[in-house]
Curated annotation (Swiss-Prot):
Active site: D68
Function recorded in the entry: Excises uracil residues from the DNA which can arise as a result of misincorporation of dUMP residues by DNA polymerase or due to deamination of cytosine.
Name of the protein this chain belongs to: Uracil-DNA glycosylase
Lineage of the species this protein comes from: Bacteria, Bacillati, Actinomycetota, Actinomycetes, Mycobacteriales
SMART domains cross-referenced by the UniProt entry: UDG, UreE_C
Reaction it catalyzes: Hydrolyzes single-stranded DNA or mismatched double-stranded DNA and polynucleotides, releasing free uracil
An annotated GO BP: base-excision repair, AP site formation via deaminated base removal
GO MF term set: uracil DNA N-glycosylase activity
Subcellular location as annotated: Cytoplasm
Keywords: Cytoplasm, DNA damage, DNA repair, Hydrolase
Family annotation (InterPro entries): UDG_fam1 (IPR002043), Ura-DNA_Glyclase_AS (IPR018085), Uracil-DNA_glycosylase-like (IPR005122), Uracil-DNA_glycosylase-like_sf (IPR036895)
Gene3D superfamilies to which the protein is assigned, alphabetical: Uracil-DNA glycosylase-like domain
Organism the protein comes from: Mycolicibacterium smegmatis (strain ATCC 700084 / mc(2)155) (Mycobacterium smegmatis)
Amino acid sequence: MTARPLNELVEEGWARALEPVADQVAQMGEFLRTELAEGRQYLPAGQNVLRAFTFPFDQVRVLIVGQDPYPTPGHAVGLSFSVAPDVRPLPRSLSNIFTEYTEDLGHPQPSSGDLTPWAERGVMLLNRVLTVRPGTPASHRGKGWEAVTECAIRALVAREQPLVAVLWGRDAATLKPMLAEGDCATIESPHPSPLSASRGFFGSRPFSRVNELLQRRGIEPIDWKLP
């Protein structure tokens, strides 16, 4: 991640929203450069670390919270749960998300694991920790990203517009008190990982429930359909 001003790294609205943690973002950039200098790689690639913040802040209607990026090289792309279009096989969590997507909405299985269309339509795909060491899950937890992503979530909640947050798993559920501070509805279920998907993620209908909550608030529903 290059050392550049925040407004050159993220969308204009996000640059304003993240201004309180601009110094922390800079410190995390320095942390990543030190990692590289000492021979330790990180994921996703530098230009994708802040990718979730390159879509318009004012257009976010839905927040889907992940934990940290996929640790498998070639998988992480800076949007929670998403992968590059050419990734095969899909990560198991994403495969389970697509199983629920087809059951909930009746759409066919998507042709790839690229969730960029959701991000372009107002769904923020945010990991609480934005980087990871390859092959080592959770390796960058507690390094400083949490302050940045917490600021981002608080900024979304503080807007004078409705938000629906999708909380998959116990880690994401800890955000519920923060989300309760504003006009934010929440949808909770177990995580889509193979360890927990059968304990309540399957059958939870998150996509149609999000749209029901948006429409109840007079907000345009999300077009979830993927190519």
